[in-house]
Amino acid sequence: MIKFTHLVHHHHDEHHHGEEHTHNTAELTICLTMQERTKSRLKVMLSDGSEAGLFLPRGTVLKEHDIVESDDGVQAMITAAEETVSTVYSDDLLLLAKACYHLGNRHVPLQVEAGWCRYLHDHVLDDMVQRLGLNVKVEQAKYQPEPGAYGGSSAGSHDGHHH
């Protein structure tokens, strides 16, 4: 069984210029849910059907397009699994910001994008968002909440502020 022990490329959402993207040589992929991407020890299934294991440093949170590598140089790219999520689409950005505030106030890991936000489906949260006057679409989609929602690996993620 292949053991992936380190992260060799941490994907960031900036747009790459030129030929930087050609260094992605991983032929294998590992499809994981958001919850699975927060685990440093996990048995996984590779895209070729074989089993492998993640043995990453504690606190590692994987993102889509990250590359993990085994000690003998085998690489695999992480892909985000589609999950049952609630997505709130709105042109009313103030109302959307208020929904994000109320969701964040409940410590809901939240993906925030231009014109929409997304969280793991929860009918109680859906009801709250609908009471604010927004529509909630329950769908199957990839889910990547804002960093920090799972504590990340940086010590003191509250920048010295205490609750």
From Swiss-Prot:
InterPro entries: UreE, UreE_C_dom, UreE_N, UreE_N_sf. One of its GO terms (biological process) is urea metabolic process. Keywords: Chaperone, Cytoplasm, Nickel. SMART domains: UreE_N. CDD domains: UreE (cd00571). Pfam families: UreE_C, UreE_N. Involved in urease metallocenter assembly. Binds nickel. Probably functions as a nickel donor during metallocenter assembly. This is Urease accessory protein UreE. It comes from Aliivibrio fischeri (strain MJ11). The lineage of its organism: Bacteria, Pseudomonadati, Pseudomonadota, Gammaproteobacteria, Vibrionales. The gene is ureE.
